[in-house]
Amino acid sequence: MIMTVSDPGGSSMSSSSAITPESEQAMAAVNDAPVGGQLLQQRLALVEDLWQTVLRSECPAEQAERLLRMKQLSDPVLPEGNAVSSDALVSLIRDMDLSEAIAAARAFSLYFQLVNILEQRIEEDGYLESIVRSQDTAEQINPFTPPLATQTEPATFRELFERLRRLNVPPAQLETLLQELDIRLVFTAHPTEIVRHTVRHKQRRVASLLQQLEAQTESSTFEAGTIRLQLEEEIRLWWRTDELHQFKPSVLDEVDYALHYFQQVLFDAMPQLRRRLSSALASSYPDVQLPPSSFCTFGSWVGSDRDGNPSVTTDITWRTACYQRQLMLERYVSAVQGLRDQLSISMQWSQVSAPLLESLEMDRLRFPEVYEERATRYRLEPYRLKLSFVLERLRLTQIRNQQLAEAGWRAPADGLLSSNPEAPQSESLHYGSVAEFRSDLELIRTSLVSTDLTCEPLDTLLTQVHIFGFSLAGLDIRQESTRHSDALDEVSRYLNPDQAYGDLNEQERVQWLLQELQTRRPLIPPSVSWSPTTEETVDVFRTLHRLQDEFGSRICRTYVISMSHSVSDLLEVLLLSKEAGLVEPSAGHADLLVVPLFETVEDLQRAPEVMEELFQTPLYRNLLPRVGSQGQPLQELMLGYSDSNKDSGFLSSNWEIHKAQIALQDLAARNGVALRLFHGRGGSVGRGGGPAYQAILAQPSGTLQGRIKITEQGEVLASKYSLPELALYNLETVSTAVVQNSLVTNQLDATPSWNDLMARLARCSRRHYRALVHDNPDLVAFFEQVTPIEEISKLQISSRPARRKTGTRDLSSLRAIPWVFGWTQSRFLLPSWFGVGTALHEELVNDPDQMSLLRTLHQRWPFFRMLISKVEMTLSKVDLDLARHYVTSLGSADHRQAFDGIYTTIAEEYSLTHRLVLEITGQERLLDADPALQLSVDLRNRTIVPLGFLQVALLRRLRDQNRQPPMSESPSDGDGRTYSRSELLRGALLTINGIAAGMRNTG
């Protein structure tokens, strides 16, 4: 037997891990919810039945029964309704060998992923019900309900516009905002996206079959039975599929994964979003003009984010752009073929506009082969003939795009297409820009409208072209600030060793950079051989120039500077851009938007000072793009949630970001600059995650003004965009929240006493957090030993290393994502709440009457309510008894006393935070205000416990072997087998997969 699950310290599972009857109350509350209730219980029962059926068919009988018994013992509410001690569960796990442990890890992982599919279906139902409800009850909407403080359901466009109408928001004010509405969602490759693309495909198949099964009526017994068999078959195939990545994904693998959501969901979802907005606007504000189709667009870091990822090269970024264009061209070809089939209009029965006929004559001269092939067939069908020419141009554009992908960014553009013997000699025959393609489609639409005809598929395609263009999503380049200063230092040392850039102070650097920006001569000699890092840094800007020449400026116009500290960080990028021809300071022209990313608390505090100096610098200000009807200069600025949280803790990080937004918006307004804030939010609360709707509504009043940019990280892509209705749910809630925040003003952020209170809480929380995380010399060892952080690094889930190359293994080298991942696996979830309890407690010790103010803040201030809501949700997922098991089982003997002290500190802080959150919210249990979420967390918390025991046992055995000589492996605990390190590692990694699925987020 390999399992040793008894606590070496003598503790056993109790208190928070005990099965409690309160879950029955949660289930009863869910029964009364609009969506859920009996349907929820039926769906849970179906998932349970499918899971049990598959286990019984795929596992040996005795093993299957033990796995089912494990699940039964971990259920919050057993069929007989009795609370059960965890002793029986411990005993059951202790008797397992490695093969059974692996089967258990896989079984529970499968269970959680099935439950995740179920919850996605429930979210879809909730969204669809909200649409129906908003149509039926618009007249009952109370505009004076304080939506910014208390609304928990995402608003639909219909609900939003009706509320605005009743609040007497003038149509002109709404129209002005809608015309300048600018929502950008940026997909990133998340290192903790743990599920294989193959498994995601099976999940979508299961979700589709579940939806089909629910659609069956009582009379369709045969069809329902057939679908049920298909479900069992699909899940059995899933069971026999390896959950673990067998190799580290390449960057292009990650690109393919991200593009899937555009291909399968978003390409078709975006026109639906616009139609819903149009319908809702017509109902409440019929005279208000629709926003441009591109009011909501997408960006991507996948294939372009090179911060700490040496695998992202200039060639990779170039190929990524080609891949994205190829995907769009394929979708456009399919759409145009559909239009050609549909638009069978004959000139015998309908007139055609003169411009369309003239364009056909031009096309005949340019494409004689196409005309000869199609003219007879479509002699009297001008739309079909025109679309045949459009298809030919798309085909030639595809050929050119493929050649570009193969040739690379350094290849000359001239002659690429003509080198293909199948292509015409004239390069201009392909679409040189998306504007040419759009012009052809508009020509067809105008002709149809002139004869009183409409074509919804054509309108849909035009919307898609406006949103996606040929590039699909703009690629943001991201690079760490020191890469630019190091490159300029190397260049300057070559040119003048006595005045090296790296030896200058900040003021001297700014002076030198401004001087170089204003001179017309090049700085970087073209024939010098630089170091590989400098060559790559400089080549990025050359690649950008070539990308924009070939694909248009839309493909890659944003350059994000991570770890921005100073004015020189931005001017360095402008100078390197000037060298590549992207910036012409003398002409006040720039084809690149330079975006500082302020990440640490100190940098967030310094950000207004940095931007003030830049806004007061004429050269910099003149290079900003102009937006809006007033032609204001636009500055995009990114706020980092991850590193500021890791640096200072949850409460301090959120408060500093909140303050920075207000200060930066005030600064921008004083300088006549439009500000677009870019929120670098992760999937977990510890990295800025949580419900987007509440998060946007909680932004300081006046900081959005219709503009926002948000990262959508790989871990959450599946939960938001895997299904069409889920995608629409997310897109509509984000859009309505931005409009609502921008128009419904909230002056509570400016309440002095509230701000003073938050400042005190943030300072105290930061002090307590840093005392544990940064000042305790044993914390690094604690984290490395009592969490599976080392094993997490063995997961083949990302092209980016888990640590920065700093030469050390301290916390500064560890990225924020695995930092959160490790704490989540061991059920501490420390980054998302630690320090909050002490801050609240000290405030109340100094003045007990402050509890009344804290409750007022929770009821009325969206920002504070969001903070407490996130802390509450995180606390509900913490399991300190299980976490204690990690400490006592995995901590080394020589650290026992120190680790016990750290655990005690964490446990005391948890108890304090838990108690005070309940006092502030006025609840008896965490999440009482959200019974559906409470039930979901209860179900998951208890069912994850067996995986925690399994993980600890496997980690303990694996680490024991790692401490032995390579050829010396002890037999397992009495079962006569010797397990290799790779076998034990595989088992441990499977438990990581399972717990990640159960927690629904990782890092």
Swiss-Prot record:
Region (Disordered): 1-24
Pfam families: PEPcase
Keyword tags: Carbon dioxide fixation, Lyase, Magnesium
Names of the cofactor(s): Mg(2+)
PROSITE patterns: PEPCASE_1, PEPCASE_2
Active site: 190, 646
GO molecular function per UniProt: magnesium ion binding; phosphoenolpyruvate carboxylase activity
Biological process, per Gene Ontology: carbon fixation; oxaloacetate metabolic process; tricarboxylic acid cycle
Gene Ontology, cellular component aspect: cytosol
Protein origin, superkingdom: Bacteria
Enzyme Commission code(s) on record: 4.1.1.31
Catalytic reaction list: oxaloacetate + phosphate = phosphoenolpyruvate + hydrogencarbonate
Cited PANTHER family: PHOSPHOENOLPYRUVATE CARBOXYLASE
Functional note: Forms oxaloacetate, a four-carbon dicarboxylic acid source for the tricarboxylic acid cycle.
Family: Belongs to the PEPCase type 1 family.
Protein name: Phosphoenolpyruvate carboxylase
Organism whose genome encodes this protein: Synechococcus sp. (strain WH7803)
